[in-house]
Amino acid sequence: MLTGPRLLDWSESPLISMYFAVEDWADKPNIDAALWCLWPTSLNQNANIVDKVEGHYIPSFEDDELQGYTVDSLRQNTRLELFPVATIATRNNARIQAQMGTFTIHHNKKIAIEDVGDHSHVAKYIIPHASKEALAEELKLLGMTRFSLFPELASVGAILKDMMK
């Protein structure tokens, strides 16, 4: 049963997703990581969000299809339980742009993404703990760093702190 946040972050970039999967390699050296892949239109079919014309439609936060997922709607319709949906946001801030961010929104129905429907909308790849450090170093060579994904001033401080260790 899901007890976590209603809004989950995803990225359109597999490299960015891999960064987040292995970034804690030093803090959790003996724990395997996981890389999750989501097929958003397949997930949305479970919530009956389908565009028969476009076929691969993903709603944005402002679209009518997501009105039932607003905080006000959830408060007013406590007995209504809808499946999670994949959505896109306006990329109007540097972090969402840098991370190529997308989201899934959970409704009152407490269900993990991987437990929705026939499970064909998601895949989980296990990254052995012994591979996490090497993958993190390779991603750094490709420009996947904390600052490139969190382009705020606070990231500079965190990077300098790490360099001083």
Regions found by a protein language model. Name each.
Residues 1-165:
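Catalytic-core elements of nucleic-acid end-processing and repair enzymes
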